[in-house]
Amino acid sequence: MTLSFTARWRDELPATYTALLPTPLKNARLIWYNDKLAQQLAIPASLFDATNGAGVWGGETLLPGMSPVAQVYSGHQFGVWAGQLGDGRGILLGEQLLADGSTLDWHLKGAGLTPYSRMGDGRAVLRSTIRESLASEAMHYLGIPTTRALSIVASDTPVQRETQETGAMLMRLAQSHMRFGHFEHFYYRREPEKVQQLADFAIRHYWPQWQDVPEKYALWFEEVAARTGRLIAEWQTVGFSHGVMNTDNMSILGLTIDYGPFGFFDDYDPGFIGNHSDHQGRYRFDNQPSVALWNLQRLAQTLTPFIEIDALNRALDRYQDALLTHYGQRMRQKLGFFTEQKDDNALLNELFSLMAREGSDYTRTFRMLSHTEQQSASSPLRDTFIDRAAFDAWFDRYRARLRTEAVDDALRQQQMQRVNPAIVLRNWLAQRAIDAAEQGDMAELHRLHEVLRQPFTDRDDDYASRPPEWGKRLEVSCSS
């Protein structure tokens, strides 16, 4: 099968991009590619042949039909209007046409200078490229909407960050890279007709059922808000902190995008700050739901020229409804509840309070809870708590709640083990793979990618363990 590409963004949205070619790296070489995703997309294996050099994965060649552009957008960063931003080191190479008629963006990150690089060098480093590849694939296999990673190219190009590192490129795939910041850019340039063109593009290609409906814009924004609510609910249930929820890092399609200073919980800490540059804690874990709403309000403002205020407010209410409904459903599943009862939130919050006091490991606690037998007063989870009396009191109430369900242990445990992962991408696991890769050893990178494809499978090795001392509270920042 021949790959087919189109250039809808370039053809339909003039003045939203600059056309340019990638700038290859020195001695670029393919070090990893996503074999399963490549098979699903019918990408010929020959494209990954190392004897052909870095090829399209390193920006050295283009495939027929590709028409590369760097997109322009703006945004609020840490709550402050930052003005024009844009693809400062990424280039949208083209949009792959799939068999069902949909498309998939091929976006090369680290592809060199663009008109939107500002003070940057247009490069990505191996460290951050590996982190994004691991995070996006981990999220996908957890069932959370996300961009995908197709390939990583390493090089000998020196890149200066906090220390000198080496340049790399990531091929990132997504149904769309349309961001809240695209709309903000033209709204603040006082070009409302271009804001409406962006909305028309989104509806035409991603919500075509509404193209001829009079209230199409209001329906579309409601769905954007609902998708955002469901996404944030998913983050909160797995203990994921994005780290830099600027409006330019928010996807119109409700995808997790732009993995930078992210982190998954080790110990349960609702005030967890993944980004050591976030000195005020704006993007701490427990702030994510309110920040997403704030970001949606910024997007809503850009839509006021063609959506009534009442309709915008209804859509923002839809965000809250979607967030709370989806979060409640997911947390009941994590606890093994098939029905909703009035005291469920209190029971969950009591567990969270106990975990916070004890510094309990978030992922391991819920995974161990998945093995609970309602007739047994003992649990291996008990041994992880210092205050056994407090745990016993909670566990008795929990087992009593389980007995109100007409579900046997086997079925309940099966459900719980489908939503409570044994494996998440802890920062120390990513760092171990990065350290090895920077020394030229890619084995751990490949191994970790394989492990992350089965997050709901119990393991007895260190991929499911708490972090070693050196891996606790690793600091990550935006310097990618």
Swiss-Prot record:
ATP binds at residues 86, 88-89, 109, 121-122, 172, 179, 258. Its EC number is 2.7.7.-, 2.7.7.108. The keyword Ion transport does not apply. Nucleotidyltransferase involved in the post-translational modification of proteins. It can catalyze the addition of adenosine monophosphate (AMP) or uridine monophosphate (UMP) to a protein, resulting in modifications known as AMPylation and UMPylation. InterPro entries: adnlytase_SelO (IPR054838), SelO (IPR003846). PANTHER family: PROTEIN ADENYLYLTRANSFERASE SELO, MITOCHONDRIAL. Its cofactor is Mg(2+); Mn(2+). Mg(2+) binds at residues 249, 258. It comes from Salmonella heidelberg (strain SL476). GO terms for molecular function: AMPylase activity; ATP binding; magnesium ion binding. NCBIfam families: adnlytase_SelO, PRK00029.1. It comes from the Bacteria. Keywords: ATP-binding, Magnesium, Manganese, Metal-binding, Nucleotide-binding, Nucleotidyltransferase, Transferase. The active site is at residue 248. This is Protein nucleotidyltransferase YdiU. HAMAP family: YdiU_SelO (MF_00692). Belongs to the SELO family. It catalyses: L-seryl-[protein] + ATP = 3-O-(5'-adenylyl)-L-seryl-[protein] + diphosphate; L-threonyl-[protein] + ATP = 3-O-(5'-adenylyl)-L-threonyl-[protein] + diphosphate; L-tyrosyl-[protein] + ATP = O-(5'-adenylyl)-L-tyrosyl-[protein] + diphosphate; L-histidyl-[protein] + UTP = N(tele)-(5'-uridylyl)-L-histidyl-[protein] + diphosphate. The gene is ydiU.
